[in-house]
Amino acid sequence: IAPFPLKLSRDRVTNENAEITFLEPNHPILNYPNRITAKDFEGWKQEQGLYYPNEWDKAFTPILASNDKGESPKKGALLVAKYGKGNYIYTSLSFFRELPEGVSGAFRLMANLISIQ
């Protein structure tokens, strides 16, 4: 499913209010067209994410991490790799739950994902 090695796990973050860690806060994917902050993860519904990768090629840059209380951080919440003339993005975040619920932060982040150059 990816142009570079990426191993998915069954890991998930079940607490929709789990704190997000910004591993690369200056990365364009978090800053254009919207500046993504912790506020964009407020009001998420049900679980925050699932099928977090636990191994990936060095071509990927981990952007976000998250974890349930008492668990180790899952740094594969959002991975970006340059590929050809564009980018390959893998995300574990539960957009399929957040977008239908109208979570504004999910829409803001999705706009950034499709706008990356």
Predicted regions and their residues:
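Catalytic beta-strand/loop cores that center a nucleophilic Ser/Cys/Thr
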Residues: 2-104, 108
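Short amphipathic C-terminal alpha-helix that caps PH/PH-like domains
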Residues: 105-117
